[in-house]
Amino acid sequence: CSTGVIGEPMPIKNLLNQLPVLADKLDRSGFRDASEAILTTDLVPKRFIIESYIAGRRIRIAGFAKGSGMIYPNMATMLAFIVCDVGIEKKTWDAMLKDSLQTSFNSISVDGETSTNDSFIAINSGELIEKQYLPIIQEGIDMVCKKLAKSIARDGEGANCLIEVIVKNAKNESDGLKIAKSISKSMLVKTAIHGCDPNWGRIIGAAGNTGVQFKLNDVDLFIGEFQILRKGKLMV
């Protein structure tokens, strides 16, 4: 996996020659070092660790990522790595990761541009955990992925704020995602936010561009804690 200038080949020979050196340097500081080594145009490293106890057993889930420009699903120019120190069967692990990806890395946008390179690598190892505890592990993976994804969006090239789009009571999840992604990708919405202009028409317009059927009279719209529309009627 790699990111960088499109079209420039990776120096594979140099990488292979350094593998033995890197292996000899493995230690507890490696997590921090790796999170910094993968950065390109990023302004800050992105790493997150959670720890908990399940049935008396300490469980840790850790992750780090990079990404700043050319960020738009599916993942775009970003790298993300997750490790978990419990054993989980591959089929179950894959399904858990797929769920986490949909609500994290596949739900962010910086510039609406995709890329030729992206990778999400997740590894689990250790004693198998009982199935009854899998929902707790899923919650932990979701938390780590969302933290890293938001860190990428917050560190977007040229970004000075982070916008979170929340859609409630859509007909189904697919419709909700379409609306949220259309609003988050809209340059008109972004310029309104950048100019501190609560131009609610641009938000509704971006939602309407999706083709999802809804009635304006059913729409409540909040910008932050301030309600702008109630049942399609202007509140301010």
Predicted regions span which residues?
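Alpha/propeptide regions of enzymes that mature by internal proteolysis
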Residues: 1-236
